[in-house]
């Protein structure tokens, strides 16, 4: 893995989301299917904006007594939108709103085929009234505060739904991670499935694997931890060390990601096929960011590889039997690379695009940075033409290491929100009139201390 710095693309401000909050905003979460986002604010509210015209659709309030720090949309919900919110008041709220189109799939289909007037006037793409006055008040009332999840002893820092939408993970300053199951019984009942307390400090972030029920967490204790269920009991399967400061955020690579190439590669190209084969063995990678001003990427060792390397004894290799979890459930993660140094202060959020494979980072220096992974010219042909026996350390020759890649900084924006720190960044599908029809064009959304939320386009 090689790192390089070469800004070759341009980030341009498309629009602010208006009107902004008058207080600090923490995080913006794109809806999984509709062209809307939810923004968490220190004014105890969540604001829902349209990505078609960048206007405020509704304000969710009344559920929390302190700042709303985090939120996440539940996936795979038909006919309504479900939003989880986490607050400094130590509680988690579940909010529900019936979708005006009746079915999410129909709403998206109408969005894709709407004419330009539908993007600006009336009900908007999400079927939510964009008007002011009484209609806005009526819309706010349509958000139902369904249930309050109480259990944490201190500020809730992050919430995340599992890929199936049946599990909700929450984490807190109290050093704990809670997993709740949505019983989906029509009565808004949630059951506590697990409480994990292995972290030695404030837990800043939780993020679910894109396809598996595997949870990653990041903490003030400088570690990343991985959690899985084994025999109906949730527990830690890996503790990743490497950062020299608080780990603020973790995010997963998309399950189908393939690095960029000097020329476009078809899906059946041998290089693409080889990458996907090796990728399938280790699964999606993790990206993390920290107070130490680095962005790091981690890869799980395939089980066959770490069994070849370690061959542990039944007692766990040290002669001391494990009383916490069986050895067979442990995972081994390697630091694959540190991305090019691009920040001067703490990095608060990283976002790995599931569509393009690009990574974005933001932090205390007010800078937005975008990174791209590319196959190294010449390495693809070399990898395909050479016979690669298994190496002495057990690394298969057709691993991604044989197809060498490099990470480049392709775009930066300094002072993206003036003098203010940027708390969060995320990718979302572009939905405004300027989008290119028939493409999965994305926008980058940044959320900052000044209360503004900005939408950016990336010109490659």
UniProtKB/Swiss-Prot annotation:
Q: Which positions does the entry assign to WD repeats?
A: 17-59, 63-105, 151-190, 198-237, 242-308, 342-381, 416-457
Regions of biased composition (Low complexity) lie at: 312-324
Which key words tag this protein in UniProt? Answer: Repeat, WD repeat
One GO cellular component assignment for this chain's record is:
cytosolic [4Fe-4S] assembly targeting complex
Q: Which InterPro entries match?
A: CIAO1/Cia1, G-protein_beta_WD-40_rep, WD40/YVTN_repeat-like_dom_sf, WD40_repeat_dom_sf, WD40_rpt
Any single GO BP term:
iron-sulfur cluster assembly
Q: Which domain of life is it from?
A: Eukaryota
For region Disordered, the annotated ranges are: 301-325
Which function does this protein serve? Essential component of the cytosolic iron-sulfur (Fe/S) protein assembly machinery. Required for the maturation of extramitochondrial Fe/S proteins.
Q: Which family does it belong to?
A: Belongs to the WD repeat CIA1 family.
Q: Which HAMAP family match?
A: ciao1
What this protein is called in its record is Probable cytosolic iron-sulfur protein assembly protein 1
Q: Which organism is it from?
A: Aspergillus fumigatus (strain ATCC MYA-4609 / CBS 101355 / FGSC A1100 / Af293)
**Gene that this sequence comes from:** cia1
């Amino acid at each position: 893995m090689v790192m390089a710095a070469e800004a070759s693309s341009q980030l341009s401000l498309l629009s602010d989301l208006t009107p902004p909050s008058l207080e600090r905003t923490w995080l913006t979460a794109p809806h999984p299917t509709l062209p809307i986002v939810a923004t968490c604010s220190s004014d105890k509210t969540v604001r829902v904006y349209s990505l078609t015209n960048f206007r405020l659709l509704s304000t969710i309030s009344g559920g929390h007594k302190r700042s709303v720090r985090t939120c996440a949309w539940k996936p795979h919900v038909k006919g309504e939108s479900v939003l989880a919110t986490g607050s400094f008041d130590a509680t988690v709220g579940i909010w529900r709103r019936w979708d005006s189109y009746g079915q999410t799939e129909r709403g998206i289909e109408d969005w894709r085929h709407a004419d330009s007037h539908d993007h600006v006037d009336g009900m908007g793409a999400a079927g939510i009234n964009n008007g002011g006055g009484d209609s806005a008040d009526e819309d706010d009332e349509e958000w139902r505060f369904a249930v309050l999840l109480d259990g944490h002893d201190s500020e809730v820092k992050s919430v995340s739904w599992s890929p199936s939408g049946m599990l909700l993970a929450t984490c807190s300053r109290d050093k704990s991670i809670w997993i709740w199951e949505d019983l989906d019984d029509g009565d808004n009942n949630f059951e506590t499935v697990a409480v994990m307390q292995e972290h030695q400090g404030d837990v800043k972030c939780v993020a679910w694997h894109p396809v598996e029920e595997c949870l990653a967490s990041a903490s003030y204790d400088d570690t990343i931890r991985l959690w899985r269920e084994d025999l109906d009991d949730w527990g830690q399967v890996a503790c990743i060390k490497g950062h020299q400061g608080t780990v603020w955020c973790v995010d997963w690579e998309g399950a189908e990601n393939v690095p960029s190439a000097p020329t476009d590669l078809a899906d059946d190209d041998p290089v693409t096929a080889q990458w996907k084969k090796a990728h399938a063995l280790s699964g999606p990678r993790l990206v993390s960011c920290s107070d130490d001003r680095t962005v790091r990427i981690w890869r799980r060792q395939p089980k066959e590889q770490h069994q070849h390397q370690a061959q542990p004894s039944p007692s766990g290799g040290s002669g001391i039997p494990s009383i916490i979890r069986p050895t067979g459930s442990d995972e081994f993660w390697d630091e694959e690379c540190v991305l090019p140094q691009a920040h001067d202060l703490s990095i608060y959020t990283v976002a790995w695009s599931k569509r393009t494979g690009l990574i974005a980072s933001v932090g205390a220096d007010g800078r937005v940075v975008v990174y791209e992974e590319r196959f190294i010219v010449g390495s693809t042909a070399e990898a395909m033409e050479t016979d690669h026996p298994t190496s002495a350390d057990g690394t298969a020759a057709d691993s991604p290491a044989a197809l060498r890649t490099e990470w480049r900084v392709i775009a930066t924006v300094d002072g993206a929100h003036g003098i203010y720190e940027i708390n969060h960044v995320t990718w979302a599908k572009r939905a405004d009139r300027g989008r290119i029809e028939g493409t999965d064009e994305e926008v980058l959304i940044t959320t900052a201390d000044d209360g503004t939320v900005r939408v950016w386009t990336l010109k490659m």
